[in-house]
Amino acid sequence: MPFGNTHNKWKLNYSAAEEFPDLSKHNNHMAKALTLDIYKKLRDKETPSGFTLDDVIQTGVDNPGHPFIMTVGCVAGDEECYEVFKDLFDPVIEDRHGGYKPTDKHKTDLNQDNLKGGDDLDPNYVLSSRVRTGRSIKGIALPPHCSRGERRLVEKLCIEGLATLTGEFQGKYYPLSTMSDAEQQQLIDDHFLFDKPISPLLLASGMARDWPDGRGIWHNNDKSFLVWVNEEDHLRVISMQKGGNMKEVFRRFCVGLKKIEEIFVKAGRGFMWNEHLGYVLTCPSNLGTGLRGGVHVKIPHLCKHEKFSEVLKRTRLQKRGTGGVDTEAVGSIYDISNADRLGFSEVEQVQMVVDGVKLMVEMEKRLENGKSIDDLIPAQK
């Protein structure tokens, strides 16, 4: 699916009704929120870097969504998008983030000492633990809209900045352009590297332009702390390791992330943040903390139980297949993570994962012994 260049005034020769996209078969947040009135009001506006309403919505027009999975259907091309096109983004954000209002303020908490427990998840069930977030560099357009020069600047800032990390964070940068196909595939299979840009959502939003120019992966020597450069966001920061010690994974995440932010601020390049949206990222689904704390957990009995989806809903968690979003679970191994990004702090979100997964393991053990789990079903968080 090619990226349609929509940055032009030519279409203003046609009325809003003539240009309004056909969203009759769509199941995404953008399609739900976009009315002809909103389209009419916003279609001739653009951000300082030239991103238009049609650029915002194109990925959601081209990808109607899935009957059972509500996708977001819009992206931001720069920091100003969320303000210039707020008539569309505000209802999308409110819908996607459980009623988060335009007047609400987000909270940030990256103090790892505030996490309770998390070092005792049973490694016979919890196979690996991971925490990730995204960060955007102020003053540079986001991946759907950035120029080649901007993208290369992001890469240069990352290479120079990350090279100064020491101790457990000492590592090396590997540009995608010099990697062999076999090396790339190995890193993807090991869950260290982002996939090749085959996702229609990525392609239709313009994020895959000039691939693999300016993209790469940096990781520390232990491969337990990684930074993806110029995929869906300028930076994706990831802390991960085998087993169930989420406390250690979160400690490394918080310490490493603070070090990276200090490096960028020192270079005169802070991250996009405001008190309403928290950290500003490309996809509205990641606003706030941008954090996804996830574990791979083996739950062959619980995953077949009729109450499984109810347990997930009540603990504010979501499940994905073993390989991440849009994949199947292999050998009853699920990727369980926090459903929220906005309105809860980093500590609160990881706490939900720790508490919820601990409960799921307890349920799995009960079911192994043929016992009921009805008394373990939690109240709604």
From Swiss-Prot:
Domain Phosphagen kinase N-terminal: start-end pairs: 11-98
Keyword Hydrolase: no
GO molecular function: ATP binding; creatine kinase activity
Protein name from the UniProt record: Creatine kinase M-type
EC nos: 2.7.3.2
Record Gene3D superfamilies: ATP:guanido phosphotransferase, N-terminal domain, Glutamine synthetase/guanido kinase, catalytic domain
Reaction(s) this enzyme catalyzes, per UniProt: creatine + ATP = N-phosphocreatine + ADP + H(+)
Entry GO terms, CC: cytoplasm; extracellular space
Entry-linked PANTHER family: ARGININE OR CREATINE KINASE, CREATINE KINASE M-TYPE
Residues binding ATP, per UniProt: 128-132, 191, 236, 292, 320-325, 335
Keywords attached to this entry: ATP-binding, Cytoplasm, Kinase, Nucleotide-binding, Transferase
